[in-house]
Amino acid sequence: MSIVVKNNIHWVGQRDWEVRDFHGTEYKTLRGSSYNSYLIREEKNVLIDTVDHKFSREFVQNLRNEIDLADIDYIVINHAEEDHAGALTELMAQIPDTPIYCTANAIDSINGHHHHPEWNFNVVKTGDTLDIGNGKQLIFVETPMLHWPDSMMTYLTGDAVLFSNDAFGQHYCDEHLFNDEVDQTELFEQCQRYYSNILTPFSRLVTPKITEILGFNLPVDMIATSHGVVWRDNPTQIVELYLKWAADYQEDRITIFYDTMSNNTRMMADAIAQGIAETDPRVAVKIFNIARSDKNEILTNVFRSKGVLVGTSTMNNVMMPKIAGLVEEMTGLRFRNKRASAFGSHGWSGGAVDRLSTRLQDAGFEMSLSLKAKWRPDQDALELCREHGREIARQWALAPLPQSTVNTVVKEETSATTTADLGPRMQCSVCQWIYDPAKGEPMQDVAPGTPWSEVPDNFLCPECSLGKDVFEELASEAK
């Protein structure tokens, strides 16, 4: 089924509700995607792009229901990737002599995928035009490396529609085609996810290319993307967002992600986050266990953040494999204007944190001091983690911090209540872990200064995860 975009322009693409992986398995398309193809019917009939190769037969059959294939005068391929040009082989088998307009680099890519050098290719460059009748022209604009060397955009005069290729798109499937018809929160989340994970490496090219396009002084009433919605309501809003995202974007946000074998590094991550929040309550802090989180959501949060803390246990003297893989991906994304710090726990020997610090620096992050803990962090080690978080908050602050009274309050409470008043320390009879009322157990929201009698009944030993009934009064303090 086709959808009228504007006047004689129809959407003839394909929705893909089920797709969950893109670029292999590197991009999770949690809300599906669409492959947008457009049919322009003027004195000349023009098809702009096709769809993903897995929908080739369905696409050609649907297109045949819209138009006699022999009446298609021109095919424009803005991008040679298989989710754009995948149905070319099926289509060209029916109309083998139809001219294909694309960049020189696209010919190499198309032949590399379809192996038909005999097709009627016509090379276009920025500023070239194609007359399609009724006083309208197509104007071509090369956009190399946004995000492939062959990429270009196509502008239709008269209707003032920019067929923008991958730019301004999103992997987002909905029965509605236009931006003003869909859930706005979902839409802009997917726009930012798309930019963060696909276009970030090319941010330095985004601003000059947008400036070049605006320099043509052409009105833009609609932006018709290759994936997701068509921008008809205030289409320049997404252009303005791209200019913002391309300018070394950051929010007052810190992302923490880690991998852990025995929860030791997780304990460090939680304590660091507590220290950050104590010192700068205005900053947004997001924590992810990489083994249980959507990788693309982590990368989107890194893109949004002013800094990232990455944690890893040591395994065979190196970092955990999932951490190594994601840091390698961050290297390729070439984030700018961001700070980083490495942390992690180890046993008899370390090595992972130092290695991780080097990799983060190589990825272009401005490095802050790293933090290491041996074995499971005790209360003193967790306090060091909290202090590390406090120092990170101070170093990474984007504005003067509010004066904190946390330390003053703790000191006053400690001096007002003696250890003796809090009762005896308690020892786990299974693993020998000791509960000290003066220190509490912040990981379970048991505040310093909490007597054992006031510890909640659902308390679990941090070492062996058994309940309160296995605890006994420490022998040295028994009367």
Curated annotation (Swiss-Prot):
What is the required cofactor set for this protein?
Fe cation; FMN
- Record: residues binding Fe cation 2: 83, 166, 227
Rubredoxin-like domain segment(s): 423-474
Q: What is known about what this protein does? A: Anaerobic nitric oxide reductase; uses NADH to detoxify nitric oxide (NO), protecting several 4Fe-4S NO-sensitive enzymes. Has at least 2 reductase partners, only one of which (NorW, flavorubredoxin reductase) has been identified. NO probably binds to the di-iron center; electrons enter from the NorW at rubredoxin and are transferred sequentially to the FMN center and the di-iron center. Also able to function as an aerobic oxygen reductase.
Q: Which UniProt keywords apply?
A: Cytoplasm, Electron transport, Flavoprotein, FMN, Iron, Metal-binding, Oxidoreductase, Transport
Top-level taxonomic group: Bacteria
**Flavodoxin-like domain: which residues?**
254-393
Asked if the Swiss-Prot or TrEMBL record annotates the protein with the keyword Oxidoreductase, the reply is yes
* Protein name (database record): Anaerobic nitric oxide reductase flavorubredoxin
> Which pathway does the database say it acts in?
Nitrogen metabolism; nitric oxide reduction
Q: Quick one: which residues bind Fe cation 1?
A: 79, 81, 147, 166
Q: Where in the cell is it found?
A: Cytoplasm
Note describing how the cofactor binds = Binds 3 Fe cations per monomer. Binds 1 FMN per monomer.
- Sequence segments annotated as region (Zinc metallo-hydrolase): 30-210
Q: Which family does it belong to?
A: In the N-terminal section; belongs to the zinc metallo-hydrolase group 3 family.
